[in-house]
């Protein structure tokens, strides 16, 4: 909790972007969809270079503002086409982005869109830990890239 209290403070483990000091975080890209494209590129590189029988996964954490960006959607189309089964994106769907409520600017049904792009789609209660664990397990056994749409309430 102390790390979250230091959000966006110099030297914290929860910095602003683009800093990579937090262990396990290879890229902290902020909004505008660059993180989605970067994560898809990392998953492609891992899949192409892996000599191991162990399946490794690339995880993307994205919000409403990220998926509204064309760069994220273009990269997502490629991930579906390439069947990047080692890619799991958690989409925190709280219906809020930097300019306010998403309904003012975006009515996209991302579950339908990602399904059409060849992704394994799951919609869950993003506050329910059991649903999160089960959705991750299901995603790890899919032969497609996975998007877990966690419906959340901001700051809950």
What are these regions (language model features)?
Residues 112-115, 120, 129-156:
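Glycine/aspartate-rich loop-and-adjacent alpha/beta segment that forms the canonical ThDP
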């Amino acid at each position: 909790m102390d790390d979250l209290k230091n959000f966006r403070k110099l030297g914290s483990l929860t910095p602003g972007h683009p800093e990579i000091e937090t262990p396990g975080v290879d890229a902290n890209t902020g909004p505008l969809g660059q993180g989605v494209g970067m994560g898809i590129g990392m998953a492609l590189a891992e899949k192409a270079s892996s000599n191991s029988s162990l399946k490794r996964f690339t995880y993307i954490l994205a919000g409403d503002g990220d998926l509204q960006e064309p760069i994220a959607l273009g990269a997502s189309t490629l991930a579906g086409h390439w069947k990047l089964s080692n890619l799991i994106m958690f989409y925190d769907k709280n219906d809020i982005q930097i300019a306010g409520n998403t309904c003012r600017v975006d009515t996209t049904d991302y579950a339908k869109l990602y399904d059409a792009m060849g992704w394994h789609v799951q919609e869950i209660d993003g506050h329910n830990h059991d649903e999160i664990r089960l959705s991750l397990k299901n995603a790890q056994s899919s032969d497609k890239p996975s998007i877990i749409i966690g419906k959340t309430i901001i700051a809950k």
